[in-house]
Amino acid sequence: VGMLPCLGSVDLKKAVSGLNLKYGKDYVAFYEPTMARFWYMNESSREKVRAELSNPKYPGSFISGAQKSSYGISHDGGKFGDDIFLLNDGFQVSPSYISRKPFKAVCGYSPESEGMSASFLSTCKPVFIPKTVADFFKLMKSDVEESVRDL
């Protein structure tokens, strides 16, 4: 659970590099195994990247505003990217900034994906039960703060 076997890979960096845009001037991208994050310096860059990656030959889609909200990243001020292109289950970005070669299995697909289920176990009663991935940071932070108070 949490890892899915890889069925294929796509070179998103090559696809975006062919759009006649200047990296650092028109856009910045970060290519991870299951997604690509984009920060745009102008609307034209956004339109070109979105048009290219919306082609069915790229097995994925851009995360919607509603999805960002449900994932707890809608008010991030662009920290996670202006756009996130998330690949479909079983596909990966290769090469990525994590690895030059494809992996046999990858984690980090959509939280709704059947293979991305998880469990939460604790040896003590938590201050609150995490509902999203972002909640785990808050839970760990509250635990550290409590430990520091006890010193």
Question: Residue ranges of each PLM-predicted region?
Answer:
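Metal-dependent active-site segment of extracytoplasmic phospho-/sulfohydrolases and closely related
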Residues: V1-K13, F85, F120, M140
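Acidic, His- and aromatic-enriched active-site or binding-groove loops in soluble protein domains
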Residues: V16-V28
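Glycine-centered secondary-structure boundary/capping sites
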Residues: G8, G18-N20, K141, E145
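Short, surface-exposed, charged loop/turn segments at secondary-structure junctions
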Residues: V10-G18, S99-A105
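Active-site neighborhoods of enzymes that stabilize oxyanions during catalysis
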Residues: K25-V148
